[in-house]
Amino acid sequence: MTAILERRESASLWARFCEWVTSTENRLYIGWFGVLMIPTLLTATSVFIIAFIAAPPVDIDGIREPVSGSLLYGNNIISGAIIPTSNAIGLHFYPIWEAASLDEWLYNGGPYQLIVCHFFLGICSYMGREWELSFRLGMRPWIAVAYSAPVAAATAVFIIYPIGQGSFSDGMPLGISGTFNFMIVFQAEHNILMHPFHMLGVAGVFGGSLFSAMHGSLVTSSLIRETTENESANEGYKFGQEEETYNIVAAHGYFGRLIFQYASFNNSRSLHFFLAAWPVVGIWFTALGISTMAFNLNGFNFNQSVVDSQGRVINTWADIINRANLGMEVMHERNAHNFPLDLAVVEAPAVNG
């Protein structure tokens, strides 16, 4: 009898836990994805803060030349970063227990891999949690779909690119100047500015900013007057009101006359779908471009493609970019190799005798 009661209490406790996890009445929705999201993001955030403040220098290139990234080792907020895991580790899974000591783990950049792996699980769980909450509320799933764009971008630079290049040391450092360094080196090695998927990403980000500003300014400029001159226009809206707060016909007429008629949406639903889809698709393409360049399917190469009748090269902007790429590549990992990879792979001329 006691065993039966204990089983009932246990089942009841589990049932109450399940109900609490999936309840939409909580101030913050947890969800089953949240059960994974909370510990992984807390771990990633905690280790990031500790490592950013106090991590010792990391031998990023695997040549016994440690690079300092933390505040206590001479950096500031702008120059500081979590240094990627050492090239000596490559793509090996490198948890703390795989190192001979904690000092060795820190020297080889173990915190970077720990942070990236937990962060990846956390943001994927956050995306799943968005879908889960939408499902429970009877909403459509497009919020999670939109969030998949930054998830894809983060996955590309932190996971796919290191896999393609053969080492986590090629991943993006977790810091401001480290991010810029990653961008410069990426351009030098892959000519990303000449990759069409990057161009689509630029169009998505800047186009999304433009469309967001246009939409916000049009709506703000065509609000239906509900207040006096002495009140804020924002007081004219009450949360949950049924009537429209702005005149879409006026906004449509203005923009149609400013550009041309068919440049303006006359359907609010299709307009907002467009505002969501444009940057999302652009960032998807950028993430796809990073993932292909990870395996050295690089941007277009138009170097020395224009010549005169005598066969002499007429430089174009492609040649200027190529010269800049070589200069940046020379300065990258300058103690790990003596020449840019583009020059190092050229065969030496044959010597007779």
Curated annotation (Swiss-Prot):
[CaMn4O5] cluster binds at residues 170, 189, 332-333, 342, 344. The modification N-acetylthreonine is found at residue 2. The chain crosses the membrane at residues 29-46, 118-133, 142-156, 197-218, 274-288. Chlorophyll a ChlzD1 binds at residue 118. The keyword Chloroplast applies. GO terms for biological process: photosynthetic electron transport in photosystem II; response to herbicide. Residues 345-353 form a propeptide. The keyword GTP-binding does not apply. Tyr-161 forms a radical intermediate that is referred to as redox-active TyrZ, YZ or Y-Z. C-terminally processed by CTPA; processing is essential to allow assembly of the oxygen-evolving complex and thus photosynthetic growth. The record marks 190 as: Stabilizes free radical intermediate. SUPFAM superfamilies: Bacterial photosystem II reaction centre, L and M subunits. GO terms for cellular component: chloroplast thylakoid membrane; photosystem II. This is Photosystem II protein D1. It comes from Chlorella vulgaris. The gene is psbA.
